[in-house]
């Protein structure tokens, strides 16, 4: 219905709901609309899990899915999600590189060998490799509030999602 009203994009955030189910519904009920998580909180989810979801949604939609990732604040990571806290910008860089390494393995068949400070992915067998896609992997957008995340977005992502409360000051 949104597409018939002239909308060309849909964004699903993660507040009081999980963001991927609304994305699936948006992709299922549209033909051309771009649909993005805006944003999915990264650190409580394994890069492998997010890579799988991104691959499946991109394949299902013939290339209309965009992956928006964010870090959330320390209190939510530690007390809501029970995830250890570390400086978010370097960890997000590693997270995105891990997702991209997984996608590269699925696209090329190269051995998975990602080893970082926070994430290690070294096992991928044919049984767990998704079918090939006819489109490219989803673009990845990073949410950010300050220069550290903006730098990460420029270095390893496809774009930056600004916080709704951002201002020039």
Regions found by a protein language model. Name each.
Residues 1-37, 138:
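N-terminal beta1-alpha1-beta2 module of alpha/beta enzyme domains
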Residues 14-17, 44-45, 86:
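Alpha-helix capping and helix-loop boundary segments enriched in small/acidic/polar residues
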């Amino acid at each position: 219905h949104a597409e018939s009203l002239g909308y060309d994009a849909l964004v699903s955030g993660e507040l009081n709901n999980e963001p991927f189910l609304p994305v699936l519904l948006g992709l299922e009920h549209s033909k051309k609309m771009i649909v993005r998580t805006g944003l999915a909180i990264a650190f409580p989810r394994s890069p492998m899990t997010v890579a799988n979801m991104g691959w499946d949604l991109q394949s299902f939609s013939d290339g209309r899915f965009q992956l928006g990732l964010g870090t959330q604040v320390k209190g939510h990571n530690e007390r809501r999600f029970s995830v250890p806290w570390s400086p978010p910008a370097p960890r997000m860089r590693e997270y995105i590189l891990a997702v991209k390494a997984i996608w590269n393995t699925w696209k090329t068949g190269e051995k998975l060998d990602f080893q970082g400070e926070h994430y290690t992915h070294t096992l991928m067998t044919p049984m767990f490799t998704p079918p090939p896609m006819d489109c490219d992997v989803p673009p990845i957008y990073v949410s950010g509030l300050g220069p550290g995340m903006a730098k990460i977005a420029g270095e390893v992502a496809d774009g930056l999602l600004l916080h709704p409360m951002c201002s020039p000051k």
